[in-house]
Amino acid sequence: MSNAISTSVAVIEEVKKADFTFDPSIRRDHAEKYRTSEWYDGRGEIRAVEDGRSFQISATFTLESEVRLVDRVFDPSNPVLAEIYKTRGRCVAVVDQTVNELYGESLRDYFKQNEIPLEALVCRAWESDKTPDTVHKILAFLGKDGCDVSRNEPVLIIGGGVLSDVAGLACSLQHRRTPYVMIGSSIVAAIDAGPSPRTCTNGNLFKNGIGAYHPPVLTIVDRTLFRTLPKGHIRNGMAEIIKMAVTDDPILFELMEKYGQRLVDTHFANIDADEELEKVADEVIYRALYSYMKHEGTNMFETYQDRPHAYGHTWSPRFEPVAKLMHGHAVGVGMAFGATLALEMGWINEAERNRIVALCTSIGLSVYHPIIEDTDLMLKGQKNIRRKRGSSGLWAPLPTGIGSCGFAGEVPPDLLISAVEEHKRFCASLPGEGKGEEMYLSDLGLE
């Protein structure tokens, strides 16, 4: 037995010497015909260690994503969707229930006139529907017992922020990565949740706690879809524009100061608007998208936490579901409190804090809610978001002026408490003590 073992070891050593050539860096190129999807690419490198017992692997993943402003996307003469789906022989779509009620006939007519079969799942997408069960429902539709989508077949998603999150997450899970095209029917979906790579569903009392990074291959922004949005939803979406104005674009901030309320009243220049306001609406959308994507698109997998677009989203993920606030109002409270905190830290002056709060209140967004007085809740929120951001710091985006920001690595409990007290004192002098219009989910029938 001993001789047999010795012989085997000797043979192995000879094979190693004869056949194994140590190469410190091995890469493989793949022929284009083997590529899984036209939107995704990847390369890798393997480095073998001379001891013959370990390897080091590094890999890169490349994706292509586009954001496009389009007018009247469901007009049968508009080629955008037809060019995507005609050659594929069908369109598989997940459509928000309300969108289906408003635009379902136009959607079906579009594909009928362009001679493209349409297979659609109509899905209710309230905040209360942002659950793993909804994701599973969409997966059943996309999977083998449903439409059996291909790994290179872009699913069409049409809806607001909730649907973009849950349907996008379903696409990330189907075949481990199925592409999708996003048409945002709300302002939140059009300029924030839609083009975002963060697909998700809610966790237990923590908003967006479960998810994956999977951006759409194309985001279509059609301002004419905002015509049918209730004003409460228009206002809700404005918070995502204001956050970029405060942290990144002073011109956008001034446009919002001057035209913000008119954009709410005219449903983003779709009703009783003149040509000037239409141009302003397009400029506001473009600037908000550009500010958002120049930070999001260059940090697509959130590998760094210097993210201005997280302004207003440090404490709100914890208190929003507890207070049952509309997302935009929770962000409004978060932004206004963040401005007061920045004032307390000496990052901005009082006039700048007041301008930020005044912009929010001018369009009816909330800037204060008693929920932030719950110190335990706020500190738990900090703990949760710190873990979510990698535990190296809190990295809360806070304004350093109008159109610029810095990132607070830590907010000690005593500073948090004093900032809340100062913010409460300041907001007590505001109309309604800082409460916004239609600030709760129940106000818009979403509960």
Go through each PLM region and give its residues.
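A glycine/threonine-rich phosphate-anchoring loop and its flanking beta-alpha core
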Residues: 169-265
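Hydrophobic/aromatic beta-strand patches that form the interior of the parallel beta-sheet core
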Residues: 94, 119-121, 156, 181-183, ...
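C-terminal charged capping/lid subdomain of soluble metabolic enzymes
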Residues: 11-42, 51-56, 239-242, 348-447
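ATP/NTP phosphate-donor binding region
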Residues: 2-154
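Generic secondary-structure signature for well-ordered alpha-helical cores
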Residues: 218, 224-225, 231, 239-251, ...
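Active-site segments that bind and position negatively charged phosphate/pyrophosphate groups
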Residues: 264-377
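A short, small-residue-rich loop immediately preceding and capping a beta-strand
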Residues: 145-185
